[in-house]
C-alpha cells in the first residue's frame, strides 16, 4: 500500500472577504471590517478528520422551556413544492433518442459556425448561440474565432465596421477576456467628443448594441460611461414613441424593452435562454436547426436539473428539516436549488448543484433562527456551539435549535470528508470557521435589533456583506468546481483578495435589500442598506434605492476587471462568483424571490426546472 500525504488548509483567524477595493470607497473608504474570531485551533491529521455523525437527542435541554417567551413570527407559508411532487418529476429528456439527435444537431451547428470566416454573420451567430443558451457547447470554437478577430484589430486588419458590428464585436471580445480598448468607439464621436447625433436617426440596432456593450465598462472607462448614458436616454425615448404609436411595435421594440429592463450582461443564462427561445421562434428569419437544438438542449438540461433536485429533496426529507418541524423558518429547498442552476447550469456540475443547494437551504434556516425566532441568549448559545464544533454542545441548545445544529454539523463534516477524498485536503477547520464567522455576523445583527441600534451604512455593510452568506457558497463552490487546487488560490480565497468573490457577495447583499425591504420591515428587522443611507444622508426612500442601484453598477465595474480567463482560480469558479451576482438580480428583481411564493417565483421555477419547452 502506498502512503498518501495529506495537505492541510489551515484557516486564518477570520475570512476577510471584503478587502480594500475601489468599490469600498463608495461606501466608507478603505477601512475593512473583520469580525472577532473564536479561539479555535487547527489540528493536523493524517487520518479522516473529526467527521463523526452525531445523534440528535430528544431530551430537553435546560434552556428548552420556551413557554413564557414571546417570539416574533414571519408567518412564512409552507412550501408549494412537496416532496412527492419533486420525486414525481419525469426527467423525460434523457438517453436515447434525445442524445443522438442532440449530437447530430450539435455537429450541424458547429459546421455552420466554423464555416463563416471572419464575417459579421459569424459574430451574429455567436450572439444568437449565447442567447439561445447553447454557446457552451462551442466554447473552444468561439474562443478560437474571437482570437482571430482580436488579432486583426491589434494589427489594424479589421474591416471598417458600422456601429452595430463594432459594438457587437466589442461585447463578445470583452466577454471572452480579450482586452479590446474602449477607444474603438471614438470613430462614432463628433469633433466635440460626443457621440454623433446622426447615429440616433436611423440606427436603433446599433444604439442597442452599443448599450449592451457599455455594461462591460471597467473603472476609469469614460467612453463607455458616456455610451451608457447616451444609449439609455435614446432607447427610453424610443420606447416612449412606441407607446405613443409613433413607431411600430416590432421585434426590435421587444428587444429594446427587454434590454432596458436589465442588460444582457447582468442576466442569468438559463432564464435568458428560455425567454429568447420563445422570442426567436416568432421571428421570420429564424434558423430551424438552431431552434430545434436550443429547445432540445434546454429540455435535456432540465431533466438533469430534475434529477439533481430529486437527490437534494431526498437529503432534505431524510434530515427531517422538510417535515414542517421548522415552522418558524423558510422551507425553500426548491428556491435554494434554483439559485444553483443559475450559478452553474452545465451538465457536468451536478455535484456542485447538489452540494450548494444543501448549503443554501441550511443558510436560510439558520438565518431565520437569528432574524426572527431566537432570543438573544439562545442565539449566543447557538453561536458558541458552532464555534466549538463539538457534538456534545447540542445538549446545551433549546430543542428547536437541535435539529438545525445536528444537520449542519453532519453536513459540513460529510462535505469535508468528500473534499479530503477528492483533493487530499483537510478542510473541516476552514469550513466550520466559515460557519462560525457567519453566525457571529448574524449575532451582531441580532444585538442591533434587540438594542434598537441603527448602524451607519458603513457599519451595516461591514457586517451585512458577510452575513448574506456568499462567502460560504464560494468556499463550497471552490472545492466543487476546482480540479487542481493550488496554495496560491487557497490563500487568496482565504484572505478575501479575489474581486469576484467580494463583489459577488456584496451584490447579493444589496440586491437582497432592494427586494426584501418591505417584508422585513413589516415583521421587524435591523435597518437595511436603504434605511441606513436614508438615516445617514436624509435622503428619501426612492433616492436611497437609486443610490443602492448605483452601487450595484459600480460593483459590476469591479467584476468586469476580473479576467476569468487569466486568473489564479479556475474559469469555472470565477464564472460562478459572477453568476451569483447575476442570480441575485434575477431572484430579487420583482421582490423577495427566495422567500415569497408569488406568481413571479412560481413562474421562474416552472420555466427553468419543471416544464419543458414543447418540441
From Swiss-Prot:
Binding of Mg(2+) 2, residues: 367, 371
Location within or outside the cell: Plastid, Chloroplast
Enzyme class: lyase
Activity dependence on pH, as recorded: Optimum pH is 7.0.
Catalysed conversion reaction: (2E)-geranyl diphosphate = (1R,5R)-alpha-pinene + diphosphate; (2E)-geranyl diphosphate = (1R,5R)-beta-pinene + diphosphate; (2E)-geranyl diphosphate = (4S)-limonene + diphosphate; (2E)-geranyl diphosphate = beta-myrcene + diphosphate
Any Gene Ontology CC annotation: chloroplast
GO terms under biological process: alpha-pinene biosynthetic process; diterpenoid biosynthetic process
Residues annotated as binding Mg(2+) 1: 367, 371
Pfam families in UniProt: Terpene_synth (PF01397), Terpene_synth_C (PF03936)
Comment block on domains: The Asp-Asp-Xaa-Xaa-Asp/Glu (DDXXD/E) motif is important for the catalytic activity, presumably through binding to Mg(2+).
Protein's name in the database: (+)-alpha-pinene synthase TPS2, chloroplastic
Amino acid at each position: 500500500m502506498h502512503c498518501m500525504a495529506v495537505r492541510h488548509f489551515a484557516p486564518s483567524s477570520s475570512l476577510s472577504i471584503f478587502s480594500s477595493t475601489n468599490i469600498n470607497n463608495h461606501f466608507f473608504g478603505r477601512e475593512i471590517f473583520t469580525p472577532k474570531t473564536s479561539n479555535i485551533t487547527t489540528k493536523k491529521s493524517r487520518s479522516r478528520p473529526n467527521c463523526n455523525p452525531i445523534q440528535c437527542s430528544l431530551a430537553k435541554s435546560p434552556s428548552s422551556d420556551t413557554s413564557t417567551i414571546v417570539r416574533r413570527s414571519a408567518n412564512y407559508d409552507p412550501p408549494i413544492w412537496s416532496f412527492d411532487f419533486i420525486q414525481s418529476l419525469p426527467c423525460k429528456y434523457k438517453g436515447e433518442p434525445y442524445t443522438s439527435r442532440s449530437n447530430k444537431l450539435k455537429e450541424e451547428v458547429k459546421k455552420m459556425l466554423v464555416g463563416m470566416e471572419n464575417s459579421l454573420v459569424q459574430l451574429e451567430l455567436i450572439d444568437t448561440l449565447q442567447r439561445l443558451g447553447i454557446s457552451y457547447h462551442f466554447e473552444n470554437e468561439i474562443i478560437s474565432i474571437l482570437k482571430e478577430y482580436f488579432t486583426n484589430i491589434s494589427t489594424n486588419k479589421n474591416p471598417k465596421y458600422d456601429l452595430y458590428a463594432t459594438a457587437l464585436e466589442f461585447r463578445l471580445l470583452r466577454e471572452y477576456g480579450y482586452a479590446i480598448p474602449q477607444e474603438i468607439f471614438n470613430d462614432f464621436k463628433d469633433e466635440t467628443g460626443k457621440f454623433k447625433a446622426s447615429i440616433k436617426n436611423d440606427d436603433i440596432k446599433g444604439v442597442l448594441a452599443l448599450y449592451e456593450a457599455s455594461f462591460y465598462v471597467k473603472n476609469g472607462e469614460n467612453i463607455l460611461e458616456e455610451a451608457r448614458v447616451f444609449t439609455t436616454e435614446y432607447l427610453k425615448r424610443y420606447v416612449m414613441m412606441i407607446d405613443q404609436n409613433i413607431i411600430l411595435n416590432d421585434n426590435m421594440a421587444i428587444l429594446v424593452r427587454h434590454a432596458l429592463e436589465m442588460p444582457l450582461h447582468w442576466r442569468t443564462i438559463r432564464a435568458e435562454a428560455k425567454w429568447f427561445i420563445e422570442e426567436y421562434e416568432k421571428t421570420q428569419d429564424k434558423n430551424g436547426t438552431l431552434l430545434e437544438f436550443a429547445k432540445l438542449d434546454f429540455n435535456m438540461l432540465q431533466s438533469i436539473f430534475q434529477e439533481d433536485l430529486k437527490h437534494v429533496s431526498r437529503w432534505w426529507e431524510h434530515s427531517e428539516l422538510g417535515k414542517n418541524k421548522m415552522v418558524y423558518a423558510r422551507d425553500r429547498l426548491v428556491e435554494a436549488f434554483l439559485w444553483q442552476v443559475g450559478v452553474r447550469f452545465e451538465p457536468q456540475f451536478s455535484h456542485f448543484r447538489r452540494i450548494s443547494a444543501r448549503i443554501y437551504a441550511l443558510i436560510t434556516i439558520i438565518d431565520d433562527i437569528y432574524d426572527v425566532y431566537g432570543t438573544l441568549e439562545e442565539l449566543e448559545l447557538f453561536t458558541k456551539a458552532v464555534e466549538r464544533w463539538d457534538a456534545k454542545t447540542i445538549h446545551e441548545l433549546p430543542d428547536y435549535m437541535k435539529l438545525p445544529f445536528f444537520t449542519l454539523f453532519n453536513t459540513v463534516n460529510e462535505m469535508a470528508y468528500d473534499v479530503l477524498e477528492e483533493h487530499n485536503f483537510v478542510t473541516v477547520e476552514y469550513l466550520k470557521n466559515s460557519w462560525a464567522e457567519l453566525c457571529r455576523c448574524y449575532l451582531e445583527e441580532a444585538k442591533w435589533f434587540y438594542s434598537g441600534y441603527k448602524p451607519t451604512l458603513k457599519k451595516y455593510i461591514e457586517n451585512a456583506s458577510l452575513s448574506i452568506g456568499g462567502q460560504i457558497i464560494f468556499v463550497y463552490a471552490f472545492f466543487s468546481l476546482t480540479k487542481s487546487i493550488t496554495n496560491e488560490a487557497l490563500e487568496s480565497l482565504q484572505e478575501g483578495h479575489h474581486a469576484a468573490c467580494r463583489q459577488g457577495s456584496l451584490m447579493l447583499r444589496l440586491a437582497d435589500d432592494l427586494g426584501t425591504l418591505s417584508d422585513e420591515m413589516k415583521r421587524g428587522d435591523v435597518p437595511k442598506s436603504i434605511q441606513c443611507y436614508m438615516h445617514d444622508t436624509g435622503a428619501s426612500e426612492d433616492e436611497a434605492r437609486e443610490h443602492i442601484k448605483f452601487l450595484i453598477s459600480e460593483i459590476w465595474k469591479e467584476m468586469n476587471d476580473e479576467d476569468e480567463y487569466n486568473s489564479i482560480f479556475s474559469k469555472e469558479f470565477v464564472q460562478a462568483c459572477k453568476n451569483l451576482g447575476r442570480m441575485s438580480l434575477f431572484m430579487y428583481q420583482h421582490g423577495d424571490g427566495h422567500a415569497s411564493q408569488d406568481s413571479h417565483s412560481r413562474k421562474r421555477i416552472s420555466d427553468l426546472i419543471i416544464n419543458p419547452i414543447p418540441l
